[in-house]
Structure formats: structure tokens, C-alpha cells
Amino acid sequence: MTEKKRFPLSLSSIAEKAPRSGARTEVNRSSTSGKVATPQTATQNASQHGKRTITPARPAEVPRKAAAAPSSNERATPLVSEAVRKAMTARVAKQGVKDSKVLAAMDAVPRHLFMEPALASQAYIDASLPIGYHQTISQPYIVARMIEVMRNNQQGGVLNRVLEIGTGCGYQAAVLSLVAKEVYSIERIKGLHELAKANLRPMRVANIRLHYGDGMLGLPQAAPFDGIILAAAGLEVPQALLEQMTIGGRLVAPVGERHQVLQLIERVSKFEWKSSTLEDCHFVPLRPGTVT
């Protein structure tokens, strides 16, 4: 009998093993016609999606590996069964995410363990949900979409070092840890930084480094980065982050105020970057400084 996969997996069980075709994953370089990622507005999304019935479905093919024993937390409730998680992954794939490594990572990370128990029943709907401090955990589709775009690089998807701006509860960092060799994540709100540490500690994720600080400044002591991903929207991407990208590196960020778009920025040379717009989105605002 094949053992079922659960998080945490060893990095080698996903990274560098999924088959890839010769072609790079196609990235839409113009705004999609009328497609808007579900807003990162927790109250609105909870009311819209909170009663949705999730029907288990088979996701796109993903690598399967031997698994660690399930935690007592996971065994305790049918709401967090593997079938429900697979239904989420299948829905993300149906929305257009094709990268098998990204889908495998989404399938492996237990999203319900990164939010309050009262919201566990909503953990696998395609919506952002509150995590405290007026912040949210991003909807599954947008997490997968941004990571897929970041991986579609000139190195065939290899990500040696990634920077995340806005750790939040730690969920996206956990997903990133399965597709990148090293993950650095910055959170400006002290309470969320501590929450992410508490969430990730029992999962024994060895390749994540969490930092408390101003994400708009980046992390120059660990630069350069093959990929940078922002979980909050500014009017523009801070120059400090652009300068911390490797040549050929990719940065994915929401940009805008009332109307926001997901933007891809690629570093072409030491003094040249090119950008393209992917689709509409809605995130919490990017702010400077720190909150104790």
C-alpha cells in the first residue's frame, strides 16, 4: 500500500524531481479579461465562501513520497482530511496553475494549522482569512500563482535563495520551502513574526529563516535572491528589493492602491529590469517600519 504524503516532507522529495517539459510555463504578460483574484479582504471572503461545500477531486499529477506520521491535530477532525486538501489543489489547478512542483507543495502543506481553530472549517476554500493584526492569509490560488510565476525562470525553475516580504502566519513560507533551497522571510509586525515561528517550529522546516524587520528594506545581508515575493501591495516596488535580485531573478508583487495588479519584474542586467502585468488582485497595503 502506498503511504500518503504529509508535511513536512524532506526538500528532496519535491525539489528537483518533478518532470518538466522543455517549454517554460506560459506566463500571461497582459491583464486577463475580467479575471480578478479573490480580494485579500477577510470579512468579505468569509461571508462569500464560508458555506461552500468542497467536493474532493483529483488534482493534477504531483510527485508522491513516503510520509511522516500524521499529527494528532490532523487526526482529530475530518475537516482537514487529505481529500479536502486535494480538492483545494485540484481547484487551484483548474484555475490555471500548471507547475507540478507548486501543486505538490500546496497539496503537502496543511493550511489549517496556520490559522485559528475556529476557522479550520474554512481553511481549504479559495479565500483569504484573518490571522490577526488586521492581516490575512492569502487565498490558495494567489499563493500558487505567484510562486509558479517566480519559478518560471531561465534556470528551469531552480530557486536557490528566495525572499518573502510579509511572513504573516508562515503558510506561504512553508509552501516556498518545498520549491526553494533557502527561504528568507521578513515580517514587520512582531506578533505575527512570533506566530509564524510558533506555527513552523513543530514542523521542523530546516530551510526557512524568519526575520523581524522592515520588509521594504529587504535583507541585504542575505542577498542576492533568485526570487522575491511580496504579500502586500505598494504603489511601486521598493528600489532596495530590486537591487537585491540576482541577474535573471524574478520578483512577483501586487502593485497599486484601490486598483491593484500582480506584477512580474525580471532583472535583465546590473542596471536594467523589465516588468509585465499579469492579472488583477487585491492585497493588504505594504507599509514601512515595524510594529512591536
Swiss-Prot record:
Keywords: Cytoplasm, Methyltransferase, S-adenosyl-L-methionine, Transferase
Entry's localization field: Cytoplasm
Superkingdom of this protein's organism: Bacteria
GO CC terms: cytoplasm
Comp. bias (Polar residues): 28-48
Keyword Transferase attributed: yes
UniProt-listed Enzyme Commission number(s): 2.1.1.77
Any Pfam family matching the protein: PCMT
GO function term, MF aspect, one: protein-L-isoaspartate (D-aspartate) O-methyltransferase activity
SUPFAM superfamilies: S-adenosyl-L-methionine-dependent methyltransferases
Leading EC class: transferase
Family annotation (InterPro entries): PCMT (IPR000682), SAM-dependent_MTases_sf (IPR029063)
Positions of the UniProt region annotated as Disordered: 1-76
Active site residues per record: 138
Family, per entry: Belongs to the methyltransferase superfamily. L-isoaspartyl/D-aspartyl protein methyltransferase family.
Known role: Catalyzes the methyl esterification of L-isoaspartyl residues in peptides and proteins that result from spontaneous decomposition of normal L-aspartyl and L-asparaginyl residues. It plays a role in the repair and/or degradation of damaged proteins.
HAMAP family, per database record: PIMT
UniProt-recorded name of the protein: Protein-L-isoaspartate O-methyltransferase
Organism: Janthinobacterium sp. (strain Marseille) (Minibacterium massiliensis)
Lineage: Bacteria, Pseudomonadati, Pseudomonadota, Betaproteobacteria, Burkholderiales
Gene: pcm
